[in-house]
Amino acid sequence: MVIRSEHRSIDAVLHGMQYLVNEIRTRKSKVDARVFSAMLYYLDAFPERVHHPKEDRYLLAPLRRDPAAKALVAELEREHALGGQALRTLEQHFIRYQEGGDKEFAAFGDAVDEFARNYWEHMRKEEERAFPIAEKVFNAEDWSAIDHAFPGDADPLAADRNTEDMQKLFSRIANLAPAPIGVGPRVR
């Protein structure tokens, strides 16, 4: 399912953010703030504005036909609705870290950990609970709608990077992030 591929892209960004936070925690490394900015922008531009609305329409809406899935669908829709606020909170912690320096890092690092943990739990819920239900209850029309809706997305980290803006964002993340995340300068 193409949604899994998009989840892997989101997962890569979350792991990248945690890796950088852990480099700062354990090595007191200096990380170019632009890489965090690009990652936060990605999380807003793709998952929040493209991926989740399409999941709501093409995955969760058809799942409502199964009475046993209604509570799960409501829970996932609520998480999607709250996702933007969670991202805004993370962005605020990042801004405070940028403005306040090292004394604000612990709160930012904790916010990254919490955001990633909640996001991973959300994706796990979709993949382990919603997808199996979809495999049982979706008809050919439902699958066709998913196939047509998702490959056209502009996910810069997925195999099909089909818009110039998203290609630029992917390149920016890859060029700013140090190895093993990208090809940017080593953290100091």
Positions of PLM-derived features:
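Small-residue-biased structural context
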Residues: 1-188
